């Protein structure tokens, strides 16, 4: 039997401090998170090709807009998770898929995601298909301080989802640029 000298608290510290101090560790943790997110999607029978297309398009827009909107690498991870998981609620209900997506994400542990991160991904997944300030019965509650980030992520995923509405991945090339304060999307199929 081999016993390590590490305590539980050492593991928790490594989980939270490691990514900030060690780039190799951060890359490995991100790889593990992405693998887990794909496993969650597969568990709920998501459309892999559509999810990856929405991810690709949303991240292309994020990469161009992030600096001007004050969004960092961690926000990029949240956009990526939202893009990949935005439709998992269809496993339960096609009609109310966004609500079930919210509930499934909230009830799932995602390595390296705080409860707040999970809530942001769940809310952005919900609002990718619903009006942000629509006060429908059964809508999840959102804290005021989360609204700006959730709105930005939901908008990116909503637009990326609309660009693959056919679920056929017709857009092969997507270039995003900013001109005179306007976002231009050049897409080729």
Name every feature range the model reports, one short phrase each.
Residues 5-7, 74, 178-180:
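Short Gly/Ser/Thr- and Asp/Glu-enriched loop/turn motifs at secondary-structure junctions
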Residues 29-32, 111, 186:
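Short, surface-exposed, polar/charged, turn-prone segments marking secondary-structure boundaries
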Residues 181-188:
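Short, aliphatic-rich beta-strand segments
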């Amino acid at each position: 039997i081999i016993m390590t000298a590490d305590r539980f608290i050492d593991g928790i510290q490594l989980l939270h401090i490691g990514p900030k101090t060690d780039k190799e560790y951060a890359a490995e943790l991100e790889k593990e998170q992405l693998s887990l997110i794909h496993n969650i999607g597969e568990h709920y029978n998501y459309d892999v090709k559509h999810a990856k297309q929405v991810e690709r398009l949303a991240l292309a827009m994020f990469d161009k807009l992030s600096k001007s909107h004050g969004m960092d690498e961690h926000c990029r991870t949240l956009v990526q998770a939202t893009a990949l998981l935005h439709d998992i609620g269809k496993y339960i209900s096609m009609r109310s898929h966004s609500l079930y997506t919210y509930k499934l994400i909230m009830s799932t542990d995602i390595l390296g995601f705080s409860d707040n991160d999970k809530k942001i991904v769940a809310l952005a997944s919900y609002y990718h298909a619903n009006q942000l300030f629509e006060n429908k019965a059964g809508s999840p509650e959102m804290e005021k301080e989360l609204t700006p980030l959730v709105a930005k992520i939901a908008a990116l995923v909503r637009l990326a989802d609309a660009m693959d509405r056919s679920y056929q991945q017709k857009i092969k090339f997507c270039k995003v640029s900013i001109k005179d304060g306007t976002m231009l999307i050049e897409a080729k199929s």
